[in-house]
Each structure stands twice: as structure tokens, then as C-alpha cells.
């Protein structure tokens, strides 16, 4: 599995960058925001999400871990694929997107190409509670994703996350949350 690339940017287009790593050129799907920060001929370090489908092997690249986490979460929403997730990241920074979800600005979300009212509403419902407002947000988001990958729904996870002690390690928080969810 490819989780990162460090190499020289050979070519940049709106949603793709070609990165040369020791003689091999990788085509990496990127948001327009990421593409704007890359420079041809310069060294780049991208966090990679590798998606293997029946008909394609895709690499998605991110400069920031927060973008990658948001992208992975968006892909879990039924009706959101890589193209729409990249369109969201092209339109909003993770912080801007978090504010849109927190303030329930469905109309702003509908401005993203490929997102209509129905999908915007679905994204809002699925992501309410994903962004937790406290100093432990990155750890809480990881706990949320871990519990979700185990099959729990956000409606079950969110109340449990609020009861967790604030300074638990990610592993301890997952264990405690699982105990609460299974009781």
C-alpha cells in the first residue's frame, strides 16, 4: 500500500499531479487547492490514499493530514465518490468545510459541482458530530472513524464520544467507547 510520495513534480493540471519518484512517475489525483500549492520542478511530499477499484488503481494526494482524513470520511458517505470529495476539497479548506457543517449551510454545499440538495442534505446528516469542538479533536475524529469502521452509526457514536475522558489515548478511548456501545 502506498501511503506517501516524496518526489519532483513533473506536471500539474487542475485535478492531477505527476510526481517522479526515482524514475517512476505517479499520476496522483489532487484538489485544486493542492494543485495550486505544487510547483513544477520542485520537490513535493504528499500523503497518499490508495484506492483500488475493479477498473482502476487510484492515488489521491494531500499536503495536509486534515485533508486526507476529511477525504476518507467523505468517501464513506453513500453517493460521494472521489470526484465529489475532491470537488469539496477544491472548494473549501477542511476548516471552512467544518464551519459549513456546523452552521448547516446546505446552500453553500450545493454550490460544489456535482452536489444537489439531496446529496447536500445527506452529507450534513452524516457529518454532524464528526467535527468535535475541543482541543482533542484529532484524537476524537480518529476514535469516531475507528468506531464507524466497526459498523457503528454516527447516532450511536456521538453520545458516547461526549462521555469519554478528555485526555485518553486513542486506543484507550476506543476501548472505553466499545465497552459503552456494547453494554
UniProtKB/Swiss-Prot annotation:
Q: Which domain of life is it from?
A: Bacteria
Q: How does it assemble?
A: Homotetramer. Forms an RuvA(8)-RuvB(12)-Holliday junction (HJ) complex. HJ DNA is sandwiched between 2 RuvA tetramers; dsDNA enters through RuvA and exits via RuvB. An RuvB hexamer assembles on each DNA strand where it exits the tetramer. Each RuvB hexamer is contacted by two RuvA subunits (via domain III) on 2 adjacent RuvB subunits; this complex drives branch migration. In the full resolvosome a probable DNA-RuvA(4)-RuvB(12)-RuvC(2) complex forms which resolves the HJ.
- Which parts of this chain are annotated as the region Domain II? 64-139
Q: Which species is this UniProt entry from?
A: Helicobacter pylori (strain J99 / ATCC 700824) (Campylobacter pylori J99)
Task: Write out the annotated subcellular location.
Answer: Cytoplasm
**GO BP field:** DNA recombination; DNA repair
Q: Where are the transmembrane segments?
A: none
Instruction: Name the lineage.
Output: Bacteria, Pseudomonadati, Campylobacterota, Epsilonproteobacteria, Campylobacterales
Function text: The RuvA-RuvB-RuvC complex processes Holliday junction (HJ) DNA during genetic recombination and DNA repair, while the RuvA-RuvB complex plays an important role in the rescue of blocked DNA replication forks via replication fork reversal (RFR). RuvA specifically binds to HJ cruciform DNA, conferring on it an open structure. The RuvB hexamer acts as an ATP-dependent pump, pulling dsDNA into and through the RuvAB complex. HJ branch migration allows RuvC to scan DNA until it finds its consensus sequence, where it cleaves and resolves the cruciform DNA.
One of this protein's Pfam families, by short name? RuvA_N
Instruction: Alphabetically list the UniProt keywords.
Output: Cytoplasm, DNA damage, DNA recombination, DNA repair, DNA-binding
Q: Where is this region: Flexible linker?
A: 139
Q: What is known of its domains?
A: Has three domains with a flexible linker between the domains II and III and assumes an 'L' shape. Domain III is highly mobile and contacts RuvB.
| InterPro entries linked to this entry | DNA_helicase_Holl-junc_RuvA_I, Hlx-hairpin-Hlx_DNA-bd_motif, NA-bd_OB-fold, RuvA, RuvA_2-like, RuvA_C, RuvA_C_sf
GO cellular component term, pick one: Holliday junction helicase complex
Mention one GO molecular function. ATP binding
Predominant place of localization: cytoplasm
Q: Where is this region: Domain III?
A: 139-183
- Spell out the residue ranges making up region: Domain I: 1-63
For the keyword Amino-acid biosynthesis, the answer is no
Protein family (similarity comment): Belongs to the RuvA family.
The protein here is known as Holliday junction branch migration complex subunit RuvA
